């Protein structure tokens, strides 16, 4: 999920030319992200883990908690199941995104010298399908839990 959000956000910022420094940072980061050694270097792993897993998960979960409690005008204790399912979905999508990114960005090009398909396109298709399936499952799970609470 966040593997799709971060590049899309940087591309949108770049398309509107808001800041030259943000563009240079994004270009530098994704140039190093495409190199195969970046995944297994200490800096690369820590920055990927922080940027694509820890920070978005904490931010989205916190925003989701406040949004749920504000929209439903209830205290946080009544919606713990929805918050836990939301957190589980974010963590699963982030872990899946990192695994797919390493698989299609590093291991698959090592196995084949020339691939008959675009690695980036295939990765985005798999991530999009996984996001749709996981989001649908989380919605169904949340609705079932809500029915059990009511």
Curated annotation (Swiss-Prot):
Transmembrane segments: 48-68, 89-109, 123-143
Topology in membrane: Multi-pass membrane protein
Family: To M.pneumoniae MPN_085 central region.
Keywords, alphabetical: Cell membrane, Membrane, Transmembrane, Transmembrane helix
Name by which UniProt lists this protein: Uncharacterized protein MPN_087
Record localization: Cell membrane
Cellular component GO terms held in the UniProt record: plasma membrane
């Amino acid at each position: 999920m966040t593997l799709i959000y971060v590049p899309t956000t940087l591309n949108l910022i770049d398309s509107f030319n808001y800041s030259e420094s943000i563009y240079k940072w994004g270009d530098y980061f994704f140039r190093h992200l495409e190199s195969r050694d970046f995944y297994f270097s200490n800096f690369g792993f820590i920055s990927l883990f922080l940027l694509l897993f820890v920070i978005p998960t904490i931010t989205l979960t916190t925003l989701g908690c406040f949004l749920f409690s504000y929209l439903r005008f209830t205290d946080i204790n009544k919606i713990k199941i929805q918050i836990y399912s939301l957190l589980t979905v974010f963590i699963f999508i982030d872990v899946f995104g990192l695994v797919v990114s390493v698989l299609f960005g590093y291991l698959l090009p090592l196995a084949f010298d020339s691939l008959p398909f675009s690695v980036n396109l295939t990765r985005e298709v798999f991530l999009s399908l996984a996001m749709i399936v996981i989001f649908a499952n989380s919605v169904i799970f949340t609705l079932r839990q809500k029915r059990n609470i009511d």
